[in-house]
Protein backbone atom coordinates (compact mmCIF):
# COMPACT_ATOMS: atom_id res chain seq x y z
CA UNK A 1 0.00 0.00 0.00
CA UNK A 2 1.43 3.40 -0.99
CA UNK A 3 2.16 5.86 1.79
CA UNK A 4 0.00 8.97 1.87
CA UNK A 5 2.21 11.86 0.70
CA UNK A 6 3.10 14.63 3.14
CA UNK A 7 4.38 18.19 3.00
CA UNK A 8 5.90 20.78 5.28
CA UNK A 9 3.02 23.21 5.87
CA UNK A 10 4.97 25.39 8.28
CA UNK A 11 8.29 25.01 10.06
CA UNK A 12 6.35 25.11 13.31
CA UNK A 13 4.70 21.74 12.64
CA UNK A 14 5.83 18.26 11.59
CA UNK A 15 4.97 17.29 7.99
CA UNK A 16 1.23 17.01 7.39
CA UNK A 17 -0.53 14.60 5.04
CA UNK A 18 -1.49 16.44 1.85
CA UNK A 19 -4.96 15.00 2.34
CA UNK A 20 -6.43 16.78 5.34
CA UNK A 21 -9.72 15.66 6.85
CA UNK A 22 -12.32 18.40 6.47
CA UNK A 23 -14.44 17.57 9.51
CA UNK A 24 -17.37 19.92 8.84
CA UNK A 25 -19.06 17.03 7.03
CA UNK A 26 -19.35 14.72 10.03
CA UNK A 27 -20.83 17.26 12.43
CA UNK A 28 -24.27 18.82 13.03
CA UNK A 29 -23.99 21.31 10.15
CA UNK A 30 -23.89 18.53 7.54
CA UNK A 31 -24.17 14.74 7.98
CA UNK A 32 -24.92 15.12 11.70
CA UNK A 33 -23.27 11.83 12.62
CA UNK A 34 -23.32 10.90 16.27
CA UNK A 35 -20.01 11.44 18.06
CA UNK A 36 -19.71 7.65 18.30
CA UNK A 37 -20.14 7.10 14.55
CA UNK A 38 -18.02 10.11 13.65
CA UNK A 39 -15.33 8.76 15.95
CA UNK A 40 -15.29 5.51 13.99
CA UNK A 41 -14.95 7.37 10.69
CA UNK A 42 -12.25 9.72 11.95
CA UNK A 43 -10.21 7.01 13.67
CA UNK A 44 -10.31 5.00 10.45
CA UNK A 45 -8.90 7.99 8.58
CA UNK A 46 -6.19 8.58 11.19
CA UNK A 47 -5.17 4.93 11.22
CA UNK A 48 -4.92 5.00 7.43
CA UNK A 49 -2.41 7.83 7.54
CA UNK A 50 -4.35 11.10 7.49
CA UNK A 51 -2.61 13.08 10.24
CA UNK A 52 -4.11 16.54 9.68
CA UNK A 53 -7.68 17.62 10.47
CA UNK A 54 -9.51 20.91 9.98
CA UNK A 55 -12.32 22.03 12.27
CA UNK A 56 -13.72 25.25 13.75
CA UNK A 57 -15.43 26.55 16.85
CA UNK A 58 -18.46 27.20 14.62
CA UNK A 59 -18.71 23.55 13.51
CA UNK A 60 -19.70 22.29 16.97
CA UNK A 61 -17.98 18.95 16.35
CA UNK A 62 -15.21 18.81 18.95
CA UNK A 63 -16.90 15.85 20.66
CA UNK A 64 -16.82 13.96 17.35
CA UNK A 65 -13.11 14.64 16.91
CA UNK A 66 -12.30 13.72 20.50
CA UNK A 67 -14.03 10.37 19.95
CA UNK A 68 -11.90 9.78 16.87
CA UNK A 69 -8.71 10.61 18.73
CA UNK A 70 -9.66 8.25 21.55
CA UNK A 71 -10.30 5.39 19.13
CA UNK A 72 -7.26 5.71 16.87
CA UNK A 73 -3.93 3.98 17.45
CA UNK A 74 -1.66 7.05 17.61
CA UNK A 75 -3.63 10.18 18.56
CA UNK A 76 -0.39 12.02 19.30
CA UNK A 77 0.42 11.95 15.57
CA UNK A 78 -2.76 13.80 14.56
CA UNK A 79 -2.46 17.56 14.06
CA UNK A 80 -5.57 19.67 14.51
CA UNK A 81 -6.38 23.03 12.99
CA UNK A 82 -9.28 25.05 14.37
CA UNK A 83 -10.76 28.47 13.66
CA UNK A 84 -12.66 31.21 15.48
CA UNK A 85 -14.69 34.30 14.59
CA UNK A 86 -13.36 36.05 17.72
CA UNK A 87 -12.27 39.66 17.21
CA UNK A 88 -10.94 40.52 20.67
CA UNK A 89 -8.65 39.05 23.31
CA UNK A 90 -11.40 37.59 25.47
CA UNK A 91 -13.05 35.84 22.54
CA UNK A 92 -9.78 34.40 21.28
CA UNK A 93 -8.82 33.10 24.73
CA UNK A 94 -12.25 31.55 25.14
CA UNK A 95 -12.07 29.88 21.72
CA UNK A 96 -8.66 28.33 22.35
CA UNK A 97 -9.58 27.18 25.85
CA UNK A 98 -12.80 25.65 24.52
CA UNK A 99 -10.87 23.65 21.93
CA UNK A 100 -8.25 22.49 24.43
CA UNK A 101 -10.85 21.34 26.92
CA UNK A 102 -13.24 19.74 24.42
CA UNK A 103 -10.47 17.95 22.52
CA UNK A 104 -8.55 17.01 25.68
CA UNK A 105 -5.38 18.58 24.33
CA UNK A 106 -2.96 20.90 26.07
CA UNK A 107 -1.75 22.32 22.75
CA UNK A 108 -3.69 23.08 19.55
CA UNK A 109 -1.46 22.72 16.50
CA UNK A 110 -2.93 25.50 14.36
CA UNK A 111 -5.46 28.18 15.27
CA UNK A 112 -6.88 30.57 12.69
CA UNK A 113 -9.20 33.52 12.32
CA UNK A 114 -12.27 32.28 10.45
CA UNK A 115 -13.49 33.72 7.11
CA UNK A 116 -11.34 36.83 6.79
CA UNK A 117 -12.23 39.09 3.86
CA UNK A 118 -9.61 41.84 3.50
CA UNK A 119 -6.98 43.93 5.24
CA UNK A 120 -9.88 45.74 6.88
CA UNK A 121 -11.30 42.64 8.59
CA UNK A 122 -7.77 41.62 9.54
CA UNK A 123 -7.28 44.97 11.22
CA UNK A 124 -10.70 44.69 12.84
CA UNK A 125 -9.68 41.32 14.29
CA UNK A 126 -6.17 42.45 15.19
CA UNK A 127 -6.67 42.09 18.94
CA UNK A 128 -7.69 38.45 18.50
CA UNK A 129 -4.82 37.88 16.08
CA UNK A 130 -2.29 39.34 18.52
CA UNK A 131 -3.75 37.12 21.23
CA UNK A 132 -3.17 34.05 19.07
CA UNK A 133 0.42 35.16 18.49
CA UNK A 134 0.88 35.53 22.26
CA UNK A 135 -0.55 32.05 22.84
CA UNK A 136 1.84 30.72 20.21
CA UNK A 137 4.77 32.21 22.10
CA UNK A 138 3.51 30.56 25.30
CA UNK A 139 3.29 27.19 23.53
CA UNK A 140 -0.49 26.90 23.88
CA UNK A 141 -0.87 26.85 20.11
CA UNK A 142 1.87 26.04 17.64
CA UNK A 143 0.94 28.06 14.55
CA UNK A 144 -1.36 30.95 13.58
CA UNK A 145 -3.32 31.58 10.39
CA UNK A 146 -6.55 32.64 8.71
CA UNK A 147 -9.16 31.03 6.47
CA UNK A 148 -10.70 32.95 3.60
CA UNK A 149 -12.79 32.90 0.43
CA UNK A 150 -11.33 36.25 -0.72
CA UNK A 151 -8.23 37.14 -2.72
CA UNK A 152 -8.33 40.48 -0.88
CA UNK A 153 -7.71 38.71 2.42
CA UNK A 154 -4.62 37.01 1.00
CA UNK A 155 -3.45 40.43 -0.18
CA UNK A 156 -4.10 41.61 3.36
CA UNK A 157 -1.87 38.89 4.78
CA UNK A 158 0.90 40.03 2.44
CA UNK A 159 0.38 43.61 3.59
CA UNK A 160 0.58 42.57 7.24
CA UNK A 161 3.81 40.71 6.49
CA UNK A 162 5.30 43.92 5.11
CA UNK A 163 4.41 45.52 8.46
CA UNK A 164 6.17 42.74 10.37
CA UNK A 165 3.05 40.73 11.27
CA UNK A 166 3.75 37.30 9.78
CA UNK A 167 1.19 34.49 9.69
CA UNK A 168 2.23 30.86 9.50
CA UNK A 169 -0.63 29.45 7.39
CA UNK A 170 -3.49 30.54 5.14
CA UNK A 171 -6.47 28.28 4.39
CA UNK A 172 -8.08 29.58 1.15
CA UNK A 173 -11.02 28.42 -0.92
CA UNK A 174 -9.59 27.30 -4.27
CA UNK A 175 -10.95 25.18 -7.11
CA UNK A 176 -10.66 24.90 -10.86
CA UNK A 177 -14.04 26.50 -11.57
CA UNK A 178 -13.59 29.37 -9.14
CA UNK A 179 -16.90 28.54 -7.47
CA UNK A 180 -17.04 30.28 -4.10
CA UNK A 181 -14.14 32.67 -4.65
CA UNK A 182 -15.81 35.88 -3.59
CA UNK A 183 -13.78 38.44 -5.48
CA UNK A 184 -11.92 36.94 -8.40
CA UNK A 185 -11.09 34.04 -10.67
CA UNK A 186 -8.99 30.92 -10.04
CA UNK A 187 -6.15 32.70 -11.82
CA UNK A 188 -6.49 35.71 -9.51
CA UNK A 189 -6.42 33.51 -6.42
CA UNK A 190 -3.52 31.42 -7.76
CA UNK A 191 -1.47 34.53 -8.45
CA UNK A 192 -1.80 35.98 -4.97
CA UNK A 193 -1.33 32.57 -3.30
CA UNK A 194 1.87 32.08 -5.29
CA UNK A 195 3.20 35.39 -4.00
CA UNK A 196 2.23 34.47 -0.44
CA UNK A 197 3.73 30.98 -0.61
CA UNK A 198 6.98 32.46 -1.89
CA UNK A 199 7.27 34.35 1.42
CA UNK A 200 7.28 31.05 3.32
CA UNK A 201 3.64 30.99 4.39
CA UNK A 202 2.01 27.55 4.33
CA UNK A 203 -1.17 27.05 2.30
CA UNK A 204 -3.79 24.34 2.60
CA UNK A 205 -6.85 24.65 0.43
CA UNK A 206 -10.53 23.97 0.84
CA UNK A 207 -13.50 23.33 -1.48
CA UNK A 208 -11.40 21.68 -4.19
CA UNK A 209 -14.63 20.06 -5.41
CA UNK A 210 -16.60 23.29 -4.90
CA UNK A 211 -18.89 21.73 -2.34
CA UNK A 212 -19.85 18.95 -4.75
CA UNK A 213 -20.31 20.92 -7.97
CA UNK A 214 -17.22 19.26 -9.46
CA UNK A 215 -17.98 15.69 -8.35
CA UNK A 216 -18.56 14.48 -11.91
CA UNK A 217 -14.96 15.37 -12.74
CA UNK A 218 -13.56 14.86 -9.27
CA UNK A 219 -10.22 13.47 -10.39
CA UNK A 220 -9.60 16.35 -12.76
CA UNK A 221 -10.66 18.89 -10.14
CA UNK A 222 -8.45 17.44 -7.39
CA UNK A 223 -5.49 17.06 -9.75
CA UNK A 224 -5.76 20.72 -10.74
CA UNK A 225 -5.54 21.85 -7.12
CA UNK A 226 -2.80 19.41 -6.10
CA UNK A 227 -0.66 20.36 -9.09
CA UNK A 228 -0.43 23.98 -7.97
CA UNK A 229 3.12 24.56 -6.63
CA UNK A 230 1.79 26.69 -3.79
CA UNK A 231 -0.69 24.09 -2.48
CA UNK A 232 0.82 22.22 0.46
CA UNK A 233 -2.31 20.32 1.52
CA UNK A 234 -6.04 20.17 0.79
CA UNK A 235 -8.91 19.66 3.22
CA UNK A 236 -11.51 17.28 1.80
CA UNK A 237 -14.81 16.55 3.50
CA UNK A 238 -15.54 12.84 4.03
CA UNK A 239 -18.45 11.09 5.71
CA UNK A 240 -17.60 7.39 5.70
CA UNK A 241 -14.85 4.83 5.20
CA UNK A 242 -15.56 4.39 1.49
CA UNK A 243 -14.99 8.08 0.81
CA UNK A 244 -11.79 7.97 2.87
CA UNK A 245 -10.49 4.99 0.87
CA UNK A 246 -11.32 6.69 -2.43
CA UNK A 247 -9.58 9.93 -1.54
CA UNK A 248 -6.52 8.23 -0.07
CA UNK A 249 -6.22 6.22 -3.28
CA UNK A 250 -6.34 9.37 -5.36
CA UNK A 251 -3.81 11.25 -3.24
CA UNK A 252 -1.38 8.31 -3.35
CA UNK A 253 -1.81 7.12 -6.95
CA UNK A 254 -3.44 10.01 -8.81
CA UNK A 255 -6.54 7.98 -9.67
CA UNK A 256 -9.67 6.71 -8.00
CA UNK A 257 -9.87 2.89 -7.83
CA UNK A 258 -12.14 1.22 -10.35
CA UNK A 259 -14.25 -0.39 -7.65
CA UNK A 260 -14.92 2.91 -5.89
CA UNK A 261 -18.55 3.96 -6.02
CA UNK A 262 -19.14 6.81 -8.40
CA UNK A 263 -18.77 10.16 -6.68
CA UNK A 264 -21.59 11.70 -8.67
CA UNK A 265 -23.98 9.21 -7.06
CA UNK A 266 -23.34 10.75 -3.66
CA UNK A 267 -23.75 14.35 -4.71
CA UNK A 268 -25.13 16.43 -1.87
CA UNK A 269 -27.27 19.52 -1.87
CA UNK A 270 -28.80 22.02 0.52
CA UNK A 271 -32.39 21.15 1.38
CA UNK A 272 -34.86 23.68 2.79
CA UNK A 273 -37.74 22.11 4.67
CA UNK A 274 -41.37 23.15 4.23
CA UNK A 275 -41.51 24.59 7.73
CA UNK A 276 -39.02 27.37 6.88
CA UNK A 277 -40.30 30.55 8.56
CA UNK A 278 -38.69 32.98 6.13
CA UNK A 279 -36.83 34.90 8.85
CA UNK A 280 -33.92 35.68 6.51
CA UNK A 281 -31.09 34.80 8.89
CA UNK A 282 -29.65 32.28 6.45
CA UNK A 283 -29.76 34.84 3.62
CA UNK A 284 -27.77 37.31 5.68
CA UNK A 285 -25.28 34.60 6.71
CA UNK A 286 -24.52 33.34 3.20
CA UNK A 287 -21.36 34.90 1.77
CA UNK A 288 -21.95 33.30 -1.62
CA UNK A 289 -25.26 35.05 -2.31
CA UNK A 290 -26.78 31.60 -2.82
CA UNK A 291 -29.85 32.15 -0.63
CA UNK A 292 -32.75 34.52 -1.21
CA UNK A 293 -36.18 35.09 0.27
CA UNK A 294 -39.04 34.36 -2.07
CA UNK A 295 -42.82 34.14 -1.99
CA UNK A 296 -44.35 30.66 -1.90
CA UNK A 297 -47.99 30.10 -2.89
CA UNK A 298 -49.72 27.36 -0.94
CA UNK A 299 -53.27 26.10 -0.75
CA UNK A 300 -54.84 26.40 2.68
CA UNK A 301 -56.79 23.74 4.48
CA UNK A 302 -60.24 24.39 5.95
CA UNK A 303 -60.91 21.72 8.56
CA UNK A 304 -64.39 23.13 9.22
CA UNK A 305 -65.46 23.06 5.56
CA UNK A 306 -66.82 26.59 5.73
CA UNK A 307 -68.55 27.95 2.66
CA UNK A 308 -66.65 30.67 0.82
CA UNK A 309 -69.16 33.42 1.65
CA UNK A 310 -69.25 32.62 5.36
CA UNK A 311 -65.47 32.25 5.51
CA UNK A 312 -65.03 35.65 3.86
CA UNK A 313 -67.52 37.30 6.24
CA UNK A 314 -65.62 35.93 9.22
CA UNK A 315 -62.19 36.77 7.82
CA UNK A 316 -61.33 33.11 7.34
CA UNK A 317 -59.44 31.95 4.25
CA UNK A 318 -61.47 29.39 2.36
CA UNK A 319 -60.16 25.90 1.78
CA UNK A 320 -58.07 25.63 -1.35
CA UNK A 321 -57.51 29.38 -1.61
CA UNK A 322 -53.81 30.07 -2.25
CA UNK A 323 -51.95 32.12 0.32
CA UNK A 324 -48.48 33.57 0.04
CA UNK A 325 -45.72 33.24 2.60
CA UNK A 326 -42.05 34.12 2.62
CA UNK A 327 -39.53 31.27 2.56
CA UNK A 328 -35.84 30.84 1.77
CA UNK A 329 -34.73 29.44 -1.59
CA UNK A 330 -31.30 28.31 -2.72
CA UNK A 331 -29.47 28.80 -6.02
CA UNK A 332 -27.61 25.46 -6.33
CA UNK A 333 -25.15 26.94 -8.82
CA UNK A 334 -23.87 29.37 -6.17
CA UNK A 335 -24.12 27.15 -3.08
CA UNK A 336 -20.80 25.61 -1.99
CA UNK A 337 -22.43 23.42 0.68
CA UNK A 338 -20.45 24.96 3.53
CA UNK A 339 -23.44 24.38 5.81
CA UNK A 340 -22.88 27.63 7.69
CA UNK A 341 -26.47 28.71 7.06
CA UNK A 342 -27.77 25.69 8.95
CA UNK A 343 -26.23 26.95 12.17
CA UNK A 344 -28.23 30.19 12.20
CA UNK A 345 -31.66 28.71 11.36
CA UNK A 346 -33.84 28.90 14.50
CA UNK A 347 -36.06 26.00 13.37
CA UNK A 348 -33.36 23.79 11.76
CA UNK A 349 -35.07 23.98 8.39
CA UNK A 350 -31.81 23.82 6.39
CA UNK A 351 -29.87 20.58 5.99
CA UNK A 352 -27.06 19.38 3.74
CA UNK A 353 -27.30 15.76 2.59
Give the label of every model feature segment.
Residues 1-76, 137:
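N-terminal binding-site loop/beta-alpha segment at the start of enzyme catalytic domains
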Residues 9, 21, 45, 53, ...:
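Conserved, mostly hydrophobic/aromatic
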Residues 10-16, 47, 66-77, 97-106, ...:
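Acidic (Asp/Glu)-rich catalytic clusters
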Residues 24-36, 81-91, 117-119, 214-216:
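Active-site mouth loops of central-metabolism enzymes
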Residues 31-45, 89-104, 150-160, 216-224:
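Short, acidic/polar
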Residues 57, 281-299, 307-322, 340-353:
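Iron-sulfur cluster-binding cysteine motifs and their immediate structural context
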Residues 100-120:
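Active-site groove signature of glycoside hydrolases
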Residues 116-277, 281, 289, 322:
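Beta/alpha (TIM)-barrel catalytic core signal, keyed to glycine-rich beta->alpha loops juxtaposed to Asp/Glu
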